From Swiss-Prot:
Its cofactor is FAD. This is tRNA uridine 5-carboxymethylaminomethyl modification enzyme MnmG. The gene is mnmG. The keyword Isomerase does not apply. HAMAP family: MnmG_GidA. GO terms for biological process: tRNA methylation; tRNA wobble uridine modification. SMART domains: GIDA_assoc_3. It is found in: Cytoplasm. FAD binds at G13, G14, G15, H16, A17, G18, V125, S180, Q370. The lineage of its organism: Bacteria, Pseudomonadati, Pseudomonadota, Gammaproteobacteria, Enterobacterales. NAD-binding protein involved in the addition of a carboxymethylaminomethyl (cmnm) group at the wobble position (U34) of certain tRNAs, forming tRNA-cmnm(5)s(2)U34. Keywords: Cytoplasm, FAD, Flavoprotein, NAD, tRNA processing. It comes from the Bacteria. One of its GO terms (molecular function) is flavin adenine dinucleotide binding. Transmembrane segments: none annotated.
Length: 629
């Protein structure tokens, strides 16, 4: 039977991609349905209990700047907050938080259940309704049919998921959850390229069986960082430390002597695993010269005794897992409460997607999260938000939107996936972005909140706070520009006490702030330049904008030069065999990838600068040289 009411957008899957997609579509006023196999696992952290990190924290801030959920949820659930790379420049500083799994799930579910225009329904999806190469709905396990103008697939590792522990394996979407086999078969019938990937998770340990007294502690930062631009540290629950132990030669001997029982090394697992989050058996074999690896013992929550040993992801048999765990300091009597495992699953080649994350072949069908070959909650959330907002726009007959590489890490992520594809689980790093100085965590709102407002993602409260911050930045910069101190002034001695070289001429507040030894906090403690802003976010922006002004201007020039060709559109129907002068290799690659723009084409391996020049000349001759806005 058909459900009586049609929807604008259907989201299939309630993980980190699905929840952001559902919230985005509903915030934009579209009638949205979130279908999940289990309402109790909405926002579930399937692997590590943490949000953020290098590159990943940047994505979380961008999701937040566009009105998303993840940053707000972790502010309510984070039990340890740290700034990584704090001693380095602002471009690579990143926020990371340990999470209480239960509090995080509660925060996500509460947000979903209180979101207007959003209905949640518990049923596994087994089929899609596709008519004339357009998706028009979904069919659940019990045969109930839902109609919609757009469908977003955010099914994580559930598509034909297979769990491996040692040489034993069984079907599963993750531990304790069934796989999605009928939907996997249905998707394989569509004209989409499909592959297999794998990921893994470590065994969970009973904290009561660990001797923490012999282990080093790792505390969070004080003052505590905050993830959301709308958040504050008072929202954070109780803060707790993590602990550090190490593998040793005994651990490595156990692993080496049992490799024949590893499904990965025995050839049972076909899927490719994540390069930057390898299993412990992979680390021991790939880095044979290392006699130890650092392992972080991370609490799973304030009311749980489970510990997540970050760094020993494994699919070795349970008896070997016990030996590995008990070989480490402080863990000699440790008990495992959940075994580690590897999971293999289907993913679909993201080169078959438009930058909006809509399929090139099935109109109205969007893909987000691990189904696109990524790994990580943050990468999934960012894709979910983008797919959700574009599904909402499509259902309202509006043009899609995707950020450029120069606008956001989300733009880098989507461009990498849609242009280059991936053969292994894709993880975001700051090193993937060409314009890191522009794409900082601290300015994600300055880059994206205005766009989010235009798209209908940003509510009145966030918009008012954003504009207040902009005014504070502008007013403070004007104040510092127009406040001067001379070498002969009474205040000069006070100022000179904080400078490596005394004043030799008149200097403004901004002149002084540009000096390496001067900080905004120090400057505004001096009589001529007091008082400091009470708005800490605005104060941080003032300091960064002043200190890095020259570098930022230079990078902006680079972006503008690049954009002239970047935004030159390529017709979707263009057969590159028509373009004389291109090599057979370039023709084959361009016809295979079907890039949307010259920028995308230039990033395809094997497409040379000479080929790009030929293409630009040909487009001009044909009168087809068009640039996107």
């Amino acid at each position: 039977m058909f459900y009586p009411d049609p929807f604008d957008v259907i989201i299939i899957g309630g993980g980190h991609a699905g929840t952001e997609a559902a919230m985005a579509a509903a915030r934009m006023g579209q009638q949205t349905l979130l279908l999940t196999h289990n309402i109790d696992t909405l926002g579930q952290m399937s692997c590590n209990p943490a949000i953020g990190g290098i590159g990943k924290g940047h994505l979380v801030k961008e999701v937040d700047a566009l009105g998303g959920l993840m940053a707000k949820a972790i502010d309510q659930a984070g039990i340890q907050f740290r700034i990584l790379n704090a001693s380095k420049g602002p471009a690579v500083r990143a926020t990371r938080a340990q999470a209480d799994r239960v509090l995080y799930r509660q925060a996500v579910r509460t947000a979903l259940e209180n979101q207007p225009n959003l209905m949640i329904f518990q049923q596994a999806v087994e089929d899609l309704i596709v008519e004339n190469d357009r998706v028009v709905g979904a069919v659940t396990q019990m045969g109930l049919k839902f109609r919609a103008k757009a469908v977003v697939l955010t099914v994580g590792t559930f598509l034909d998921g297979k769990i491996h522990i040692g040489l034993d394996n069984y079907s599963g979407g993750r531990a304790g959850d069934p796989p999605s086999i009928p939907l996997s078969r249905r998707l394989r019938e569509l004209p989409l390229r499909v592959g297999r990937l794998k990921t893994g998770t470590p065994p969970r340990i009973d904290a009561r069986t660990i001797d923490f007294s012999v282990l080093a502690q790792q505390h969070g930062d004080n003052p505590m960082p905050v993830f959301s631009f709308m958040g504050n540290a008072s929202q954070h629950p109780q803060q707790v430390p993590c602990y550090i132990t190490h593998t040793n030669e005994k651990t490595h001997d156990v692993i080496r002597s049992n490799l024949d029982r590893s499904p990965m090394y025995a050839g049972v697992i076909e899927g490719v695993g994540p390069r930057y989050c390898p299993s412990i058996e992979d680390k021991v074999m790939r880095f044979a010269d290392r006699n130890q690896h650092q392992i972080f013992l991370e609490p799973e929550g304030l009311t749980s005794n489970e510990i997540y040993p970050n760094g020993i992801s494994t699919s070795l048999p349970f008896d070997v897992q016990m030996q590995i765990v008990r070989s480490m300091q402080g863990m000699e009597n440790a008990k495992i409460v959940r075994p580690g495992y590897a999971i293999e699953y289907d993913f679909f080649d993201p080169r078959d997607l438009k930058p909006t994350l809509e399929s090139k072949f099935i109109q109205g069908l969007f893909f987000a999260g691990q189904i696109n070959g990524t790994t990580g909650y943050e990468e999934a959330a960012a894709q979910g938000l983008l797919a959700g907002l574009n599904a909402a726009r499509l259902s309202a007959d509006k043009e899609g939107w995707a950020p450029a590489r120069s606008q956001a890490y989300l733009g880098v992520l989507v461009d990498d996936l849609c242009t280059l594809g991936t053969k292994e689980p894709y993880r975001m790093f700051t090193s993937r972005a060409e314009y890191r100085l522009m794409l900082r965590e601290d300015n994600a709102d300055l880059r994206l909140t205005e766009i989010g407002r235009e798209l209908g993602l940003v509510d009145d409260e966030r918009w008012a706070r954003f504009n207040e911050k902009l005014e504070n930045i502008e007013r403070e910069r004007q104040r510092l520009k127009s406040t001067w101190v001379t070498p002969s002034a009474e205040a000069a001695a006070e100022v000179n006490a904080h400078l490596t070289a005394p004043l030799s001429r008149e200097a403004s507040g901004e002149d002084l702030l540009r000096r390496p030894e001067m900080t905004y906090e120090k400057l505004t403690s001096l009589t001529p330049f007091a008082p400091a802003l009470t708005d800490e976010q605005a104060a941080e922006q003032v300091e960064i904008q002043v200190k890095y002004e020259g570098y930022i201007a230079r990078q902006q020039d680079e972006i503008e030069k690049q954009l002239r060709n970047e935004n030159t559109l390529l017709p979707a129907t263009l057969d590159y065999r028509q373009v004389s002068g291109l090599s057979n290799e370039v023709i084959a690659k361009l016809n295979d990838h079907k890039p949307a723009s010259i920028g995308q084409a230039s990033r395809i391996s094997g497409v040379t600068p000479a080929a790009i020049s030929i293409l630009l000349v040909w487009l001009k001759k044909q009168g087809m040289l068009r640039r996107s806005a």
